[in-house]
Amino acid sequence: MSLNQILSLKKGEGKFLLIAVLFIFSLFASYSLLRPIREALGISGGTGELKWLFLGTFIATIVGSILAMILSGMIKRKLYTDFIYGFFALNLIGFFALLHQISQGSEAYSIVARSFYIWVSVFNIFVISTAWSLLADVFSKERSARLFGIISAGASLGGIFGAFFVSVLSKFIDVPSFIFISIICLGISIVLKNLLIK
């Protein structure tokens, strides 16, 4: 039995599926690299601030969700995804630069750390949800029924990879370096996204 038969692939679908799996893997790897960093930075100013961070995250999530719905209805899908991914990639570069330059323990560092904690939740709303919407658009209903299980496995593996990477290397790599690796993963997913919707 061939691989195409095992995966229920029709002629010409193998390459397209591979791109989709690598796209979602890279994206979830990027996000899962940020989550442990988010938690570490969130408590860097003390656990007493967590309730305010939770409140800020709650408000940012509501505002972000509303904004995402408005923008997705106003902008064409390709332009919307290009804008969202480009915007958040620039955000990550900004956080990387700030956390690399500002001395840890300073008030400025605490402000950036708290902002990053809330920002990661907004990243999840826009970038992750947009990815699934994009895949739903480029895959027909029939293709989705056959192939989304495989793509979902790619997302799970990406999440596991990112979390494992942080757990293994956290003693050797600083926070800005993990953010830089996340930027690379996001950049790879942007390239693959363009291959999906070209």
Language-model regions, residue ranges each:
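Helix-loop boundary and gating motifs at the non-cytosolic
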Residues: S2-A60
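Hydrophobic core of transmembrane alpha-helices in multi-pass small-molecule transporters
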Residues: F25, A29, E107-V127
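Glycine-rich segments within core transmembrane alpha-helices of 12-TM secondary carriers
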Residues: K51-V63, A145-S167
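Helix-to-loop junctions at the C-terminal end of transmembrane segments
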Residues: G64-L79, F164-K171
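Symmetry-related core transmembrane helices of the 12-TM Major Facilitator Superfamily/SLC fold
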Residues: G86-L92, P176-L195
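C-terminal ends and interior cores of transmembrane alpha-helices
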Residues: G86-Y109
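Intracellular juxtamembrane helix-capping segments at the cytosolic ends
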Residues: N124-S140
